[in-house]
């Protein structure tokens, strides 16, 4: 599901003012997501936190919002836990262009008794994205976490397509250049401006 609130942020990249976005599946229903089958945490630690190595191929189980027919209507699948899961076609076509900012690792998506080849995307670059003074926080067991939605900084730089926040590995943004790449290659990914 898409969040009801978002914020617009202009990104200053080499003199250009750009929007930042979150990405979503083009299959828009509340049950369109996939759960990671493995429970050991090593895949999550590697993809999201850059810890360890990618030794076992991730397997995702699609929930009832995806079918063997409508899975071809999207090139990005939301996952639980939160990771980037892209279609095989997207990855083969754009991996070289995105190689400085995204690494891709093979994964499987199971829909009932069918398997589809997908790829996990691992964001390589971290940048100061969140305005730590204006954002709200919550605590769990004495550890402080950024409350969502965060307030983003007005001038963000240091990347072309996507980055994760330097303080929170699960806050990601995608720039206009990424959106233009998706649109010009006719990929099916939805964009929500963080405005």
Describe the residue ranges of each PLM region.
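Short coil/turn motifs at helix boundaries and re-entrant loops, enriched in small/polar
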Residues: 84-91, 171-176
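Short, Lys/Arg-enriched N-terminal segments with co-localized hydrophobic residues
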Residues: 3-17
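N-terminal ordered "arm"
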Residues: 18-59
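Short active-site loop/helix that positions an aromatic residue
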Residues: 89-99, 181-185
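Short, well-structured beta-strand/strand-turn elements
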Residues: 98-109, 188-194
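Short secondary-structure capping micro-motifs at structural edges
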Residues: 76-82, 89-92, 103-110
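N-terminal low-complexity, intrinsically disordered segments
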Residues: 47-83
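Acidic, proline/glycine-rich low-complexity IDRs
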Residues: 4-5, 113-120, 124-195
């Amino acid at each position: 599901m898409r969040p009801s609130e978002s914020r617009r942020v202009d990104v200053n990249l080499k003199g250009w003012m750009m929007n930042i976005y979150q990405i979503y599946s083009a299959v828009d229903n509340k049950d369109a997501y996939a759960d990671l089958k493995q429970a050991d945490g090593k895949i999550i630690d590697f993809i999201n936190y850059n810890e360890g190595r990618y030794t076992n191929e991730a397997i995702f189980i699609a929930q009832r919002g995806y079918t063997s027919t409508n899975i071809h209507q999207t090139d990005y699948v939301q996952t639980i836990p939160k990771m980037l899961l892209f279609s095989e076609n997207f990855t083969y076509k754009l991996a070289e262009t995105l190689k400085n900012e995204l690494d891709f690792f093979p994964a499987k998506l199971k829909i009932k008794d069918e398997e589809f080849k997908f790829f996990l995307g691992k964001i390589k670059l971290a940048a100061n994205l969140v305005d730590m003074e204006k954002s709200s926080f919550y605590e769990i067991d004495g550890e402080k976490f950024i409350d969502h939605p965060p307030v983003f900084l007005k001038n963000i730089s240091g990347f072309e397509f996507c980055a994760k926040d330097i303080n929170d590995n699960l806050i990601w943004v995608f720039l206009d250049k990424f959106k233009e790449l998706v649109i010009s290659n006719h990929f099916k990914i939805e964009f929500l401006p963080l405005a």
